[in-house]
Amino acid sequence: MQAFVQFLGSNPYILLFLTIGLAVWVGKFSIKGYGLGAVAAAIVVGCLVATVGAAYGVKFHLDEFAKSLLYYLFMYGVGLRVGPSFVNALNKESINYAILAIIAPILGLAIVVLGTQFFGLPLGAAGGMLAGSQTMSAAIGSAEQAVSAGVLSLGSESPEQISAMIALSYGITYIWGTVGIILLCKYLPRIWGVDAKAAALEFEKAHGVPNVDDAGLTAFHPFDLRAYRVENPESIGKTVQQFRTRFPQYQVVNVERGDQLLGPSAETVLQQGDVVALGGRLEEMTANMGVLGPEVPDARALNIPLDQAEILVTNKEVTGRPLKTFRGSELAGQIQLQRVERSGVPLPIGLETTLQKRDVLFVTGLQPAVSKAGEIFGVIARHSSATDLLTLSFGMILGFLIGLIEVPAFGAKVGLGNAGGLLLSGIIVSSISSRLRFFGNTPNAARNILEDLGLIGFVAIVGINAGADLLTQLTGAIALKIFIVGFLASTIPPIIVWAIGFHIMKINPALLMGATAGARSHSGPAREAAKEVGSSVPWLGFPVGYAVSGVLLTVFGYFAMVLAH
């Protein structure tokens, strides 16, 4: 064992990725659905590895440059993810959710700062408690930035000791921070005496929102494509345009005459024996089965090339409109809306689902219809797995330049720093690229690498570097005080957010369950809330708060450190 520990001490890259791998493995374990997750496991595993090393006389220490670089990549990735929704939060439809997402982080920060001062907790505790109680691991990074930026008076304590206290406080408060918000989002309606299931059902009926979580894979398709042989005298001799005028609910997508495929030209005259591929809603297809003639299994006529695309909603004329207003459009029967995403979060698709700018529509249909849909709704973004590294590089440079900007305030110079600058530049780049879609492509998988590897790697290094000093910081009295402050910071803000949303903003309780989860930037409670009410409605209240609170909580680790001392 001694030789293995010394080997790790001599090979820091192996040490780092061993810690990351073990953290991901440990993070997969759960008890009744509750587990640490990879990020929390990274700091636990990192501290454990460092403690084992110290027991054998080897003090592990990984490079500060690598730690900072990983964190900066993560911050830029966060900006890319939340950018469009963060901008969307400024519109009037989303303002209530944005307000709730501002209230919760501020309350959490205030409780942590006051609790630290009341109990006289050591440096580093405030940053760790904020990160753990709000389950925002990224706040560890901004807390560390407060130490490295030199804005704190360290006194006799070393940066390693402060990092150890950040890690310790995070670990003590994280478990209740995770479990508590899930329990609150599930049971706050019951505490208030509200039937959230009935509220969700009422919203579904009023807005046509299906329970997509339970939909699964079914054989039902609302749109259909069938082939008919022209034998009805009323249709023989009519042009395709005349047929469309008489039956606007159908779309002629192909005409086969003998060995020729004539396509859906409006001027084509239908002749006896032609085979017409007809598209439309299923109920319409079965209502007038003899309008052309008998149905035939003509594979050649039905062999219609289909297209798939992601359409970014940018057209002002369609934003704010519910989906039901498009039912009678020329696209009916030619495209199928498979999914709607807002800030990367899938939304339930219902007749009253209202489109917002920068929503992404995933459609499948006839090639001309998909192109037409792109013109109507905004911009077609063809799927690409290639990452625009040029934009990524210049986006990172922009972030570092923003971080250099400092303004005089309160007798000192204040700026966003590198981390804040990268977060802001990520928001700017993703907001612009989501509008144009001609540059800056960063597929979800690539962005996930920036976020996951960046944060897990950063937290692992924090744990490794702090672990040797961890045991010297730990006493029963300090641990109890940290837990109390973390418990209050995790529990009080969601209750106040719920009360404001329910009594003042009059938000539907099912939506408010998701909004409360979003205000804590945690998807787990929204998922559990959806299960609790048996509906997807809570997800509709989630995306805006998730984006806003995610940005605030990420940077509040810095302010917790500064304000608490």
From Swiss-Prot:
Keyword Repeat: yes
Cell location: Cell membrane
GO CC annotation terms, alphabetical: plasma membrane
Domain RCK C-terminal: 210-295, 296-379
Keywords, sorted A to Z: Cell membrane, Membrane, Repeat, Transmembrane, Transmembrane helix, Transport
Gene3D superfamilies: Regulator of K+ conductance, C-terminal domain
Transmembrane segments: 4-26, 33-55, 68-90, 97-119, 162-184, 389-411, 415-432, 453-472, 482-504, 539-561
Chief place where the protein resides: membrane
One GO MF term attached to the UniProt entry: monoatomic cation transmembrane transporter activity
NCBIfam families tied to this protein: YidE_YbjL_dupl (TIGR01625)
Protein family (similarity comment): Belongs to the AAE transporter (TC 2.A.81) family.
Record's protein name: Uncharacterized transporter BB2657
Native source species: Bordetella bronchiseptica (strain ATCC BAA-588 / NCTC 13252 / RB50)
